UniProtKB/Swiss-Prot annotation:
Family annotation (Pfam families): DUF5576
Gene (UniProt): C1orf220
Protein name: Putative uncharacterized protein C1orf220
Provenance organism: Homo sapiens
Length: 134
């Protein structure tokens, strides 16, 4: 379980980093080394929110939607799987970079717990994706 003190610390660090984020050029460039571990945690939290709230299968036909007001275009099952693979790769990249930069034991424990949660959610999505290639 994540300690409340660790969550609060992470929340404050993420807020600081979001105020000074640079222009986003791609998934891996969103995590510049000079911003420190809080930048990577912020990036992972943003992707967790996408996983938790935006992605859902719609009508069982392998297309993606979220809510009735969703503006995300429908993707084929193959595209879904490729996109999930890229996300998994990006999350692994973030985890490796953060492990190299984190020196505080309490923050490291928090990061490990957070990364386990995000990989579990992503693996559940990959395992539950219905692929209907016809």
């Amino acid at each position: 379980m994540i300690p409340v003190r660790g969550l609060w610390y992470c929340y404050l660090q993420v807020k600081k980093v979001r105020l000074r984020e640079a222009e986003r050029l791609g998934p891996k460039s969103q995590c510049p080394a000079e911003c420190g571990a809080a930048s990577w945690i912020s990036w992972v939290l943003q992707h967790q929110q996408l996983l938790a709230s935006e992605w859902a299968t719609k009508d069982g036909r392998g297309t993606w939607g979220s809510k009735p007001s969703c503006t995300v275009p429908a993707l084929s099952a193959t595209s879904q799987l490729l996109q999930l693979g890229r996300l998994n790769s990006d999350l692994q990249f973030v985890r490796q970079r953060a492990k190299k930069s984190v020196s505080s034991p309490s923050l490291l424990q928090f990061w490990c717990c957070l990364s386990r949660l995000s990989f579990h959610a992503l693996n559940q999505k990959i395992n539950s994706t219905n692929i209907n290639i016809t």
